[in-house]
């Protein structure tokens, strides 16, 4: 098959440029997916932004020989090179948090863009390794196996030579799986009910008895008119997960339509909270190319040091993004928890999660229904009796 396939791990951008991406593309994309996808979804904002940046930068290099030479010899165009270094810093942070991420971009090998994509990818990977003092950027057998099992089969289904040779068609595929390394210690496991959203088309519209992990720890919480939230830090990289529970009369869609305001709310001071999180895993396998139709991708890069007015159209954009909510260690199963007078935050209904740090969003998900996503367990009481 005549094409150029680039495998890369997601990297970083500077504060100003990142905020532009987050607002102009990522949040618009999330709203579009939320609008047309009633089921659960998991979206690696990090991977998608990196794919768009690589294509944009490659198009800029294609039209500027001096910029291309600068990237090759590492001299001149300091702002562009610094932008690449900033992507590397963000990748290092995600890598430290043990994100499993991989992307591929494919265009016809006959096109000049193929060589430019390869160059941009090589510079990005070199920049990532400059920040990688622990050497965990280097390819590993585990990552190769993960790429093979999760991405190559999907790519083969829709990347065909006849398509790639038909003009400048671009195909992208993005894979991500994250199992959060919670900083908080979970003490026990208990079976509780999760109230599914009846409008999502899943088989079960009744509450599902699911295993939940329980932690009594000190957390930061937040509150808006639409949601109440709790921030659960990860054990590395200064990342964490913000869980947003919609208030009565508010939906997850309402939260996602106003996500920028939700995630920028100041947190309350730390306090002891009984946290109950469902134990489950979810995968979002979808072609998201159509969701970019109403988004001006080029406007996103107006502040980039890589200058290009070329249109970006990705003909196929397949994502395979997943999340696993699970304890780090095996927990003792208990029948009940004495919460006393301490505040309880129980994630027992549809919710939104955001993996983030103080500046950047790394992943966003909406969980409407847990039917079939957890181990089958029995609750001690019928839901109607509670």
From Swiss-Prot:
Positions glycosylated per UniProt: 24, 378
Keywords in alphabetical order: Behavior, Glycoprotein, Protease inhibitor, Secreted, Serine protease inhibitor, Signal
Record Pfam families: Serpin
One CC-aspect GO term: extracellular space
Family annotation (PROSITE patterns): SERPIN
SUPFAM superfamilies (UniProt xref): Serpins
Main location (coarse class): secreted
Residues spanning the signal sequence: 1-22
Gene3D superfamilies named in the record: Alpha-1-antitrypsin, domain 1, Antithrombin, subunit I, domain 2
Result of altering residue 22 to H: In strain: ZIM5C, ZIM10C, ZIM16C, ZIM18C, ZIM28C, ZIM30C, ZIM34C and ZIM53C
Tissue expression from the record: Main cells of accessory gland and seminal fluid.
Effect of residue 359 to V: In strain: Canton-S, ZIM12C and ZIM16C
Site positions per UniProt: Reactive bond: 339-340
GO BP, one annotated term: sexual reproduction
Intracellular or extracellular location(s): Secreted
Role of this protein: Responsible for physiological and behavioral changes in mated female flies. May play a role in accessory protein regulation and/or in the coagulation of seminal fluid to form a mating plug.
Family recorded in the similarity comment: Belongs to the serpin family.
Protein name: Accessory gland protein Acp76A
Phylogenetic classification of the source organism: Eukaryota, Metazoa, Ecdysozoa, Arthropoda, Hexapoda
């Amino acid at each position: 098959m005549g094409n150029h396939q680039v495998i890369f791990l997601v990297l970083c951008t500077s504060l100003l440029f990142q905020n532009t991406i987050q607002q102009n593309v990522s949040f618009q994309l999330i709203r579009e997916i939320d609008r047309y996808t009633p089921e659960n979804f998991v979206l690696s904002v990090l991977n998608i932004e990196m794919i768009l940046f690589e294509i944009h930068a490659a198009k800029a290099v294609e039209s500027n020989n001096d910029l291309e030479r600068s990237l090759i010899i590492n001299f001149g165009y300091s702002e562009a090179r610094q932008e690449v270094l900033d992507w590397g810093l963000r990748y290092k942070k995600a890598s430290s948090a043990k994100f499993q991420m991989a992307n591929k971009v494919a265009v016809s090998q006959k096109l000049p863009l193929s060589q430019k994509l390869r160059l941009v990818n090589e510079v990005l990977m070199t920049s990532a390794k400059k920040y990688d003092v622990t050497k965990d950027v280097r390819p590993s057998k585990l990552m190769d196996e993960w790429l093979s099992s999760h991405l190559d089969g999907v790519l083969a289904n829709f990347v065909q030579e006849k398509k790639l040779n038909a003009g400048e068609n671009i195909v992208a595929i993005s894979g991500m799986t994250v199992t959060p390394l919670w900083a908080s210690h979970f003490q026990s496991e208990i079976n509780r009910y999760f109230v599914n959203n009846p409008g999502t088309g899943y088989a079960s519209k009744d509450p599902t008895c699911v295993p939940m992990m329980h932690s009594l720890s000190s957390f930061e919480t937040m509150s808006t008119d639409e949601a109440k939230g709790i921030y659960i830090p990860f054990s590395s990289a200064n990342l964490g997960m913000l869980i947003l529970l919609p208030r009565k009369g508010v939906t997850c869609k309402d939260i996602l339509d106003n996500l920028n305001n939700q995630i920028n709310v100041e947190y309350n001071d730390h306090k002891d909270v009984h946290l109950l999180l469902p134990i489950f895993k979810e995968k979002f396998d979808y072609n998201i190319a159509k969701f970019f139709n109403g988004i001006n991708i080029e406007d996103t890069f107006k502040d980039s040091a890589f200058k290009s007015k070329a249109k970006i159209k990705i003909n196929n954009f397949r994502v395979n993004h997943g999340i696993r909510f699970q304890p780090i260690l095996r927990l003792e199963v208990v029948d009940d928890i004495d919460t006393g007078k301490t505040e309880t935050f129980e994630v027992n209904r549809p919710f939104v999660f955001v993996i983030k740090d103080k500046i950047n969003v790394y992943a966003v998900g909406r969980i409407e229904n847990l039917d079939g996503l957890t181990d089958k367990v029995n609750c001690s009481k019928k839901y109607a009796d509670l």
